[in-house]
Amino acid sequence: MVSRWEKLKNNPQTKSIGISIFLMMITRVIDFSRPSLLWPLRILYATVNIVQIGIFLYTKIIIEKKNDLTVLKYVEPATPMSGREHSKFVATTVRDYDLSKLLTSFKQMLVTIATTLFMHLYMGYAPPLLLQSVSAARGLFDNSEVQIHVQNKPAIDELRRPFKSSGGLLGSFGQVLTDKKSVDEAELTKLKPT
């Protein structure tokens, strides 16, 4: 039986929070106004993002090359942010599911890059460059698609499709249902497949 401490210690969100707190303490000590420190930090940030984009594109190529057309059926619960009142039946292929999740992660990465660049270039803050360089590298290897297709981890437990929501702020509103009863019921009632 896994203890709560082990679960907490192995949780990627907990690790990210711990690393962020540690880096925030470091940023209070470092003088980011020195050009001898600022330019290498900018180069590090640009390099991490270029590598991240490259790995996302490489993962996309691998997914398309595998072309896994296994049918994946699940019921997506309605959440306050989805704008739907009822659950939605989804029938797709593993390939399309993986590509859609990878695209979602890619869009999140672009929003993070835009926010960080705005804070650095317009507002003049340098610490986000360090924080995002480290968290981007960590987040990339915590990405389910990268773990399955680049690191060749088996798609079991946490990596089983459809992926469980991360739990975050709205994760408690419902998980994706994959049990046969829920899927059959949704298919029969035709909850508008996508």
Curated annotation (Swiss-Prot):
Please give the superkingdom of this protein's source: Eukaryota
Q: Which UniProt keywords apply?
A: Endoplasmic reticulum, Membrane, Phosphate transport, Transmembrane, Transmembrane helix, Transport
One Pfam family this chain carries? Pho88
Chief localization: endoplasmic reticulum
Signal peptide interval: none
- Cross-referenced InterPro entries, in alphabetical order? SND3_fun (IPR012098)
Q: Which GO terms describe its biological process?
A: phosphate ion transport; protein insertion into ER membrane; protein targeting to ER
The answer to whether the entry has keyword Endoplasmic reticulum is yes
- Transmembrane stretches, start-end: 43-63, 110-130
For this UniProt entry, what's an example GO CC term?
endoplasmic reticulum membrane
In the bilayer, the protein is annotated as:
Multi-pass membrane protein
Tell me where it resides: Endoplasmic reticulum membrane
* Coiled-coil segments on the chain, per record: none
Report the function annotation for this chain: May function in a SRP (signal recognition particle) and GET (guided entry of tail-anchored proteins) independent pathway for targeting a broad range of substrate proteins to the endoplasmic reticulum. Involved in inorganic phosphate uptake. Also involved in telomere length regulation and maintenance.
Among PANTHER family, the record links this protein to:
SRP-INDEPENDENT TARGETING PROTEIN 3
Say which family it is in: Belongs to the PHO88 family.
The name this protein carries in UniProt is SRP-independent targeting protein 3 homolog
Which organism is this protein's natural source? Answer: Schizosaccharomyces pombe (strain 972 / ATCC 24843) (Fission yeast)
The encoding gene is pho88
